[in-house]
C-alpha cells in the first residue's frame, strides 16, 4: 500500500484515488477441511488518500485493524454461506461447466482483477524435514501476471530468508522500486534479482 501510494502521489498531483490490495485468506485455519481445492476467500485492505496524507505507521495501524476486524470466523462463515448458496442455485447448476469457466474468467479479467490496485499472497514460513534443509537455499513463489495494469506480489520464507516476488503487466517498475527503497531506508538488507533489461529500474 505504501509503494502504491507513493507511485500515485508522484504521477497524479490533482486527483488521488483509493488504493486497495486483494489478499487471499486460507479458510483452513478457521474451518478444517480435507479438500484439495482452493479453500480461500478474499479481503481488500485499502487506504484512501483523499482523506489526507498517511504516514507509513498510519498505514500499518489501519491495515492491522482492518485485518483484525474482517478475518474472524463470523465474517468468513458469511462468505462461505454466500458462495455455497450460489453453487446450489438450480439455474447455475444446469449451466455446462465450460460456460461457467468462460464466465468466471471473464468476470475476473473485467471486474475482479480491476477491483484492486495490486494482489498480495503470503505463504508464510515453509517447513521441511531436517534432512532436507542443507540442500535448500530458499523457496520462491509467484502469482500469475495480472490481466489488468497492476502488480502482483507473493511472499514466502524459509529459515532466515524472506523472498518477495513481483509479477506485473506494467513496463515500469515503479511499485517495486518504491517498495524495496523503503526496506533499504529502514535498514533491511535487500538482494534484488530481476529479469528486466533496464538495470536502472531499481
PLM features: residue spans?
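Short amphipathic alpha-helical segments
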Residues: 1-2
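Acyl-thioester-dependent acyl-group transfer interface
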Residues: 6-202
Amino acid at each position: 500500500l505504501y509503494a502504491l501510494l507513493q507511485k500515485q502521489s508522484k504521477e497524479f498531483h490533482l486527483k488521488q484515488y483509493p488504493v486497495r490490495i486483494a489478499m487471499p485468506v486460507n479458510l483452513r485455519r478457521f474451518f478444517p477441511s480435507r479438500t484439495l481445492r482452493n479453500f480461500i476467500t478474499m479481503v481488500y485492505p485499502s487506504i484512501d488518500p483523499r482523506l489526507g496524507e498517511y504516514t507509513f505507521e498510519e498505514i500499518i495501524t489501519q491495515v492491522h485493524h482492518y485485518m483484525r476486524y474482517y478475518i474472524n470466523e463470523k465474517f468468513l462463515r458469511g462468505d462461505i454461506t454466500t458462495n455455497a448458496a450460489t453453487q446450489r442455485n438450480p439455474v447455475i447448476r444446469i449451466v455446462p461447466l465450460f460456460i461457467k469457466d468462460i464466465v468466471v474468467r471473464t468476470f475476473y479479467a473485467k471486474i475482479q482483477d480491476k477491483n484492486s490496485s495490486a494482489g498480495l499472497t503470503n505463504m508464510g514460513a515453509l517447513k521441511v524435514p531436517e534432512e532436507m534443509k542443507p540442500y535448500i537455499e530458499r523457496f520462491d513463489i509467484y502469482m500469475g501476471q495480472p490481466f489488468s495494469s497492476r502488480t502482483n506480489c507473493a511472499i514466502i520464507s524459509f529459515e532466515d530468508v524472506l523472498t518477495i516476488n513481483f509479477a506485473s503487466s506494467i513496463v515500469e517498475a515503479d511499485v517495486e522500486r518504491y517498495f524495496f527503497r523503503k526496506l533499504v531506508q529502514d535498514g533491511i538488507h535487500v538482494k534484488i534479482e530481476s529479469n528486466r533489461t533496464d538495470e536502472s529500474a531499481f
